Structures are given as C-alpha cells and as structure tokens.
C-alpha cells in the first residue's frame, strides 16, 4: 500500500532528513490519515522541496559547473524568499553538453521526472491558493508514490554514487566501527539505485570495498 510504503520510507531514513523536512513529512501523513488531503499534499510537497534544498546546499559543486553560478545557486537556497523557485530551477535544469556554453545539470534524475514536476508544482499551487481544482486522496497518493520511487535516488552526484560512497565509508575503520551493521545501507540499494544501474553498482561496490 502506497501510504504504508511512504511511512516506512520516512521512518527508515530519518537520518537523511533534517528536523524540518521530517516534520513536514510526518505532518503530511497525519493530515492524510485524517482525510485532510489539500494540506497533506502541500506539506509533502514542502517536505520534498526542503529535502532537495538541503542536498544541494550540502553538496560539492558538480564537475564542470561554473563557480560563480554555483555560488548564486547556494545564495538563493539560503534565502527564505528565493529557495522555492531555486529548487524548482535545480530540478528543471537539464544537461546540455553541446550548448554554448555547455549546461551542467545540478541534480542527477530522469528528465521525464523533471518534466512531471511541473504538474506536481501546479497541484501545490492549487492547494496553497484553494483554487477550484479538486485535490483528493489520489493526488496525495500519486505524489507519495513518486517520492517512494525516486526521492532517495535524486542527488547531486546520483543515488548510485552517493550510496557507493556511503559503503566505502562504512568499510573504512577510520570512519566507521567494524561492529556497526551495514544492513541499513543494504536496505537502501533498491531505493537509491535504478535497476538499469545495478550491474555498475555492484562492480563499483566491489571496487569500493576491495582494499579491505
């Protein structure tokens, strides 16, 4: 069931969410359970926006990205009045290596998902401004389903690379106790790695842990 999967996603990945993001998602779930669907959608959207805001703010500049533009992105993400629009821009920005100058995407995510996000944003606007558009459980569940499938896969470096780095750190005794379980990382594989990347992931995993 979509709602139960979303609850599980949030509960099992609290360490990846800051207090504000976690609170927004938890409040969204409470509203959904109470049948308050407009607010449930709005809070889930805000939670996702905060999640993207944080991962971009905490990331290193993507390879090939213009430093001045990166500084501008970071400044807007820190501004409470500008971050929402900047998050949307980050999501929409596609790579165009043949452009003049070449364009580097900030977020590693499917272009189809970038295109779909205009729909999600429009529904957010419907919720926020109480427009005539009827927001019901199906809209909230559709958004939850998208989050279940893609949220942890979306990073600046890509979900696969991010998870490989976490595995590398987990097997490094200078960073992680040998007694610490890697099961939480194993549980993230299906959430963060696209099926088409699995072979590359396991090749990378062998390389990342081979020095041990």
Where are these regions (language model features)?
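Charge-enriched, short contiguous segments at helix-coil
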Residues: 103-162
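Solvent-exposed, non-transmembrane interaction/regulatory regions
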Residues: 72-73
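Charged alpha-helical initiation segments
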Residues: 1-40, 172
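Short, mixed-charge amphipathic alpha-helical segments
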Residues: 13-16, 78-123
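Short, glycine/acidic-rich hinge or "gate" loops at secondary-structure transitions
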Residues: 59-68, 165
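Polyanionic, low-complexity intrinsically disordered segments
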Residues: 142, 149-212
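Short alpha-helix boundary/capping elements
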Residues: 48-56
């Amino acid at each position: 069931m979509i709602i139960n999967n979303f609850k599980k996603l949030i509960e099992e990945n609290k360490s990846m969410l800051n207090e504000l993001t976690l609170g927004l998602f938890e409040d969204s779930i409470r509203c959904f359970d109470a049948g308050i669907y407009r607010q449930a959608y709005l809070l889930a959207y805000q939670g996702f926006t905060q999640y993207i805001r944080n991962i971009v703010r905490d990331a290193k500049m993507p390879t090939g990205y213009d430093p001045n533009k990166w500084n501008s992105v970071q400044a807007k993400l820190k501004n409470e009045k500008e971050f929402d629009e900047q998050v949307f821009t980050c999501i929409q920005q596609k790579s165009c290596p043949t452009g003049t100058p070449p364009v580097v995407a900030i977020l590693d995510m499917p272009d189809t998902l970038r295109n779909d996000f205009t729909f999600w944003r429009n529904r957010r606007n419907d919720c926020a401004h109480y427009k005539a558009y009827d927001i019901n459980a199906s809209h909230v569940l559709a958004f939850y389903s998208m989050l279940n499938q893609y949220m942890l896969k979306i990073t600046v470096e890509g979900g696969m690379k991010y998870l490989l780095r976490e595995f590398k750190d987990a097997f490094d005794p200078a960073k992680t106790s040998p007694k610490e379980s890697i099961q939480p990382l194993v549980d993230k594989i299906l959430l963060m790695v696209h099926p088409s990347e699995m072979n590359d992931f396991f090749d990378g995993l062998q390389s990342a842990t081979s020095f041990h």
